[in-house]
């Protein structure tokens, strides 16, 4: 008896094991099914050309969307002029939620295997040349909400199984050759259309062949009333939600997973799993095997490469080379999480990422005009120079980006390497703050943290350099130096100035010229005098307020934004001048006591602790 029980247990285990195997859909099987569909549809060589049969994971293919577990959830192949048939192998995609193949010339019948797509919520095969009967297996799709089979050549009766779809909201079967009686319960669906068939909409309880919602007649007044009512209702609901969230945040503060964007921005909360997962091979091909000719820069965690995806989208691929070292992998996870929730028009958006056993990569949009540093100092002869209006817009855009990081993210985000090289420029020369590799999430209860000093000499705030303590005021200092770069076109630290004067640091250089009222010697010669003197003076004043020695004296970024917009600068500048006179007298007194000399600095190079971006 005991032996018999063991045999039954073994058999049950074996059956369970094989059942699990059968229910598991591997990326290989998904890719094979999709590629079989491509063949059956008779796709041309230039259509779906990135669908590679040898690629394990189809989640990188065009028109395919996957979830965070690499299961295919959406396939959209609309208006591509296919002339083939549907493949029954699509039926293995049991996680597929949306299947759209409308507007093609697909022939043949709808496969019975489509009834295996049990996760499907939307099936759209409108405007094709499909023939045969509607499969009764469609009734297995209990989650189906939208079924659109309009404008085909389907015949036969409407299967009774469609009455067993509890979530169906839209049923559009018009313009076919269907015949017979329409099941009574289908008239209870909110939106239906059975017109242009040989169907019987009468019977014992006559019904219109099209629902009021689906009717396309000229009753514009009722439609207008409905639309107005819906819009008004939605407006009231949205206002109530916003009011609720505002009151909730006033009492409880920000939650970790919620951020408040500035006016005019769309709240786009992006979960980690919703970022695009790139295949290693895809990025390898995009960057020409990470060719040195495609290197855009090198940072503290690796190089950045220019890449081109199969759809000709240009990207910047950041390849992390030290993720196995302490902090490397954690830095990757921190950056992915941080960038994905910090969404603002003046912040660099993360497109996606790639992880393998040996690689960690981040993918960003490619900025057409590269960086502010490049446009200021590395343009070729004949290239357009940044005019003054563009420079003002860049200054304000970058300030708004840093304001968002400091004051609208919870916890706040400290960049810690603010400089012109990390302010990127899009196709419209709008400022886009990039490189969060050095960014640090700071607990709201702390104003600073002691950590390893990272940054670029000439941009690092004095308290950060001497103590390792950083805060948002550290970024404000770096931003002030960046403003001086924007005005002068010069580097933050330049030893060539030793030939003429002692001021190696751009900050000291500008302070000296400002005291001497030599504005023309400060402004970038490339502007060729095309600027407004008062506006340049205002920008220099903001820069000097941002670079005060004591972090407590520096404005926060929201104040910087207001000052750049013309509010509150005069009062702050007057206070600064009074303090600066006292500091200058003290400095001159100390200078008379000590011989500073030049030899200790003359042969040094600029030190970039984090590397170029």
Swiss-Prot record:
Q: Which reaction(s) are listed as its catalytic activity? A: L-seryl-[protein] + ATP = O-phospho-L-seryl-[protein] + ADP + H(+); L-threonyl-[protein] + ATP = O-phospho-L-threonyl-[protein] + ADP + H(+)
Q: What is its EC number?
A: 2.7.11.1
The segment(s) forming the Protein kinase domain are 290-569
Residues modified as Phosphotyrosine are 464
The PTM Phosphoserine maps to 371, 466, 471
For this UniProt entry, the molecular function terms from Gene Ontology, in alphabetical order, are: ATP binding; identical protein binding; protein serine kinase activity; protein serine/threonine kinase activity
Which UniProt keywords are listed? ATP-binding, Cell membrane, Glycoprotein, Kinase, Leucine-rich repeat, Membrane, Nucleotide-binding, Phosphoprotein, Receptor, Repeat, Serine/threonine-protein kinase, Signal, Transferase, Transmembrane, Transmembrane helix
Q: Where are the catalytic residues? A: 417
Sequence ranges on the Extracellular membrane side: 32-225
Parts of the chain on the Cytoplasmic side: 247-613
Q: Which residue ranges contain the repeat LRR?
A: 95-117, 119-141, 143-166, 167-189
Q: How does it sit in the membrane?
A: Single-pass type I membrane protein
Q: Which residues carry this modification: Phosphothreonine?
A: 287, 313, 390, 450-451, 456, 467, 547
Q: Where are the transmembrane segments?
A: 226-246
Decide whether keyword Signal is in the record: yes
Protein name in UniProt: Probable LRR receptor-like serine/threonine-protein kinase At5g10290
């Amino acid at each position: 008896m005991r032996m018999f029980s063991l045999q039954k247990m073994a058999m049950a285990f074996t059956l369970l094991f094989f059942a699990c195997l059968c229910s598991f859909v591997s990326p290989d099987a998904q890719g094979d099914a999709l590629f079989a569909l491509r063949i059956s549809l008779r796709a041309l060589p230039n259509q779906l050309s990135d669908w590679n049969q040898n690629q394990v994971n189809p989640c990188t293919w065009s028109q395919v969307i996957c979830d965070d577990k690499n299961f295919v959830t959406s396939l959209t192949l609309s208006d591509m002029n296919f002339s083939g048939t549907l493949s029954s192998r699509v039926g293995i995609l049991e996680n597929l939620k949306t299947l759209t193949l409308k507007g093609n010339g697909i022939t043949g019948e709808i496969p019975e295997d489509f009834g295996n797509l049990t996760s499907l919520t939307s099936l759209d095969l409108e405007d094709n040349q499909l023939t045969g009967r509607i499969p009764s297996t469609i009734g297995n799709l209990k989650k189906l909400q939208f079924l659109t089979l309009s404008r085909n050549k389907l015949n036969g009766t409407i299967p009774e199984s469609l009455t067993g779809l509890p979530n169906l909201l839209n049923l559009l079967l018009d313009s076919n050759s269907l015949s017979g009686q329409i099941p009574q319960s289908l008239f209870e669906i909110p939106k239906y259309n059975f017109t242009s068939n040989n169907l019987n909409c009468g019977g014992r309880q006559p019904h219109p062949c099209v629902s009021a919602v689906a009717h396309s007649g000229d009753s514009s007044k009722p439609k207008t009333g409905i639309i107005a009512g819906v819009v008004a209702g939605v407006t009231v609901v949205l206002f109530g939600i916003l009011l609720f969230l505002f009151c909730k945040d006033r009492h409880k503060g920000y939650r970790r997973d919620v951020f408040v964007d500035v006016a005019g921005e769309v709240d786009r909360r992006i979960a980690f799993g919703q970022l695009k997962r790139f295949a290693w091979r895809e990025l390898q091909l995009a960057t020409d095997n990470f060719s040195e000719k495609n290197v855009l820069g090198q940072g503290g965690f690796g190089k950045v490469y220019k890449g081109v995806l199969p759809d000709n989208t240009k990207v910047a691929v950041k390849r992390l080379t030290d993720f196995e070292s302490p902090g490397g992998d954690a830095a990757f996870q921190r950056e992915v999480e941080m960038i994905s929730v910090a969404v603002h028009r003046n912040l660099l958006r993360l497109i996606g990422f790639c992880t393998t056993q040996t690689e960690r990569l981040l993918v960003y949009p490619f900025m057409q005009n590269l960086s502010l540093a490049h446009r200021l100092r590395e343009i070729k002869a004949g290239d357009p120079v940044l005019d003054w209006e563009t420079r003002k817009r860049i200054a304000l855009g970058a300030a708004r980006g840093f304001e968002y990081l400091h004051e609208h993210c919870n916890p706040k985000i400290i960049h810690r390497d603010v400089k012109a090289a990390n302010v990127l420029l899009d196709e419209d020369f709008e400022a886009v703050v990039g490189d969060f590799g050095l960014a640090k999430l700071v607990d709201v209860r702390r104003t600073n943290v002691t950590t390893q000093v990272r940054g670029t000499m000439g941009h690092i705030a004095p308290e950060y350099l001497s103590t390792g303590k950083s805060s948002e005021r550290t970024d404000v200092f770096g931003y002030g130096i960046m403003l001086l770069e924007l005005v002068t076109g010069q580097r933050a630290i330049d030893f060539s100035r030793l030939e003429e004067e002692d001021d190696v640091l751009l900050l000291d250089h500008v302070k000296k010229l400002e005291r001497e009222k030599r504005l023309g010697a400060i402004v970038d010669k490339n502007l060729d005098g095309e600027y407004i003197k008062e506006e340049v003076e205002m920008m220099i004043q903001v820069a000097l307020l941002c670079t005060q020695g004591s972090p407590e004296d520096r404005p926060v970024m929201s104040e910087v934004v207001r000052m750049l917009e013309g509010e509150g600068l005069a009062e702050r500048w007057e206070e600064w001048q009074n303090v600066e006179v006292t500091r200058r007298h003290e400095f001159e007194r100390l200078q008379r006591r000590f011989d500073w000399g030049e030899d200790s600095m003359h042969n040094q190079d600029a030190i970039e602790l984090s590397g170029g971006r």
